[in-house]
Design a protein with these regions (language model features):
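Beta-propeller blade termini and top-face loops
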Residues: 1-166, 171
Length: 171
């Protein structure tokens, strides 16, 4: 696809066949953040500004840095001069089809959930967690617990949104 900000001509748009892009609504600026991946349906930043993406079909967890070129499902990369693409950081597998990604940064759940990456798994009908362990300049993603197994084939989680509210009456 040729992607750009609203109103751009085809000549102003950038080609992207897989990856993560972002648009700044007040500056009206479009940029490709990273290339590769396959259906990165979840992306979030942790407390330290490190981004992680969850993907569908291919290995599910990637530490994403701006400008990186990552493993993808099909076709050669747009840039023929890369030596190799950046691989997954996970050391385990879930069933395929992940959707959503959210680092838990609040303090309502027990302390062991802080900084975990929450994601939905469409085929498992569950909300799962991964625990990131620093390794060199990146991480290893370990399997956390299955936070919310639904045991309901009708429940297909796709997006993860964590809401924190405080009620002054509780104080």
């Amino acid at each position: 696809s040729n992607v750009g900000k609203p109103g751009d001509t085809d000549a102003q748009r950038q080609f992207i066949d897989a990856g993560i892009w972002r648009y700044h609504p007040t500056r009206k600026a479009f940029e490709i953040f990273a290339r590769g991946l396959s259906n990165p349906w979840g992306f979030d930043f942790n407390d330290y500004g490190q981004g992680c993406a969850t993907c569908c079909v291919i290995p599910h967890l990637f530490h994403v840095v701006q400008g990186g070129t990552y493993h993808k499902q099909a076709r050669p990369h747009v840039n023929p001069y890369i030596y190799d693409d950046i691989k997954t950081i996970r050391d385990h597998t879930h069933l395929s089809a992940h959707g959503g990604a959210r680092f838990y940064l609040a303090d309502v759940f027990p302390a062991e959930y802080r900084d975990r990456l929450f994601m939905c798994n469409i085929h498992e009908h569950a909300v799962l967690t991964d625990v990131l362990e620093p390794k060199g300049s990146s991480f290893i993603g370990h399997h956390g617990d299955d936070f919310l197994p639904t045991n309901d084939l009708g429940w297909v989680g796709f997006s993860v949104c964590l809401l924190y509210t405080s009620d002054a009456a509780d104080d």
